[in-house]
Amino acid sequence: MDTAELTRLADCPAPAKLNLFLHVIGRRPDGYHLLQTAFRLLDWGDALSFELRHDGVVARATDLPGVSAEHDLVVRAARLLQSYTGCRLGADIRVDKRLPMGGGLGGGSSDAATTLIALNRLWRTGVRGEELTALGLRLGADVPFFIFGRDAFAEGVGDELRPLDLPPAWYVVVAPPVTVPTVEIFAAGELTRDTEPIKITDFAASTTRNDLQAVACSRYPEIGAAIDWLAQFAPARMTGSGACVFAQVASEDDAERIVASCPGSYRAWKARSVMQHPLRGWVG
């Protein structure tokens, strides 16, 4: 379709991510943490729709509970693209929110990345991939990964990305009944920030960990309980700063069986890895 004809982009995927491991290896003078992590994309996530406006207004067609428009990453992403390009067009944005908030699955960051990618297309602003990635970093450390659009080994504050070739896999993701503020975990005095850096060739789930997990579990025991429950079936750990935990399983049948046995106090989903972001072809 000629982009000149576009007035609407519907059901644009904003996939979840897993941190297969997450090491905190230092802290910059400006307070940002230096990380090493392996990002993995999943076939499960939010979906966003964008309707072109000619009055320059960016409006949410759906509210996000507890989040004002000024603090909504989707709205901020749209306005950032407007400001950066001088675009006078606007958009009505609808978010079908499927990922749990405060879960460590990158939902807000993924929504922001999809907004930048989709509106760059809808508005025909012509921002190239590297510039779009730099804009994403201004919104959050995880946003560049979703614009990068494939499994990655990440360093720096999460913005130094290298492709990571991983075999396909099935996962079970479990959400305990808590929401974890990322800032709280990274600001914790007990968080260790001196893990020895590893090389990309050394990456293996058996020799890595999530440095944020112990802090999150001490403050939110429900996370530790969810890990213990899931670990009955396969090695389990937390993703991101929590609260969701995950385990890799052998097959879709195994994933479905575990999800079906999930206690009522938790929510559980099956998810499959994907080779690349569904919108990667839109990033120039």
Swiss-Prot record:
InterPro entries: GHMP_kinase_C_dom, GHMP_kinase_C_sf, GHMP_kinase_N_dom, IspE, Ribosomal_Su5_D2-typ_SF, Ribsml_uS5_D2-typ_fold_subgr
Pfam families named among the record's database cross-references: GHMP_kinases_C, GHMP_kinases_N
Protein source organism: Aromatoleum aromaticum (strain DSM 19018 / LMG 30748 / EbN1) (Azoarcus sp. (strain EbN1))
Record field: catalytic activity: 4-CDP-2-C-methyl-D-erythritol + ATP = 4-CDP-2-C-methyl-D-erythritol 2-phosphate + ADP + H(+)
Family, per entry: Belongs to the GHMP kinase family. IspE subfamily.
Gene Ontology molecular function, alphabetical: 4-(cytidine 5'-diphospho)-2-C-methyl-D-erythritol kinase activity; ATP binding
Name of the featured protein: 4-diphosphocytidyl-2-C-methyl-D-erythritol kinase
Cystine crosslinks: none
Active site: K17, D142
Pathway stated in the Swiss-Prot or TrEMBL entry: Isoprenoid biosynthesis; isopentenyl diphosphate biosynthesis via DXP pathway; isopentenyl diphosphate from 1-deoxy-D-xylulose 5-phosphate: step 3/6
